[in-house]
Amino acid sequence: MKRVFAILTVIALSPAMSLAEGHDLFSNKFFSTITSEEMMEGKTGHIHHATNDSLWDWTDAPDGWPKANSAKCHLSNVLSDEKKPLFGVWFCESIDPDGDVSLWSGSWNVAEKSSIGQLVGGTGKYTNAGPRKCNLKTLVRISDTQKLHECVAIK
């Protein structure tokens, strides 16, 4: 199950990709630590749920945005009967160092090799941010529960 989660984490966690009003997308790295996970067994497939704490490195963020942010993320993933990842949804909630609140959501699909995320809503600088796309990959697998990822903007 931990290998499945490693794959799902890479596919699903693109909320660290941001679009600031009047700015282009910016790429970033993020570190995730699993805090809980659960597998619900079905006959023809399974549902994997996980929660993680993420630290987002926004070094290339536009002026006025913090250079780092943290979030709690929740993932619900559909697996085949052989426990291979198929698709899923995620959402992340965050209060940044400036006190601005944001809620992010998205979906991913293995067949399409995609993860699409958007800002559901927020306050302050997040009020006018919009949807974004990025390519995700794992840079370092530190342990079964900790990974460093990269989210590269698709412009």
Predicted regions and their residues:
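Sec-dependent N-terminal signal peptides
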Residues: 4-14
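Sec/Tat signal peptide C-region and signal peptidase I cleavage site
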Residues: 15-21
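Beta-strand-enriched cores of mature, soluble protein domains
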Residues: 21-155
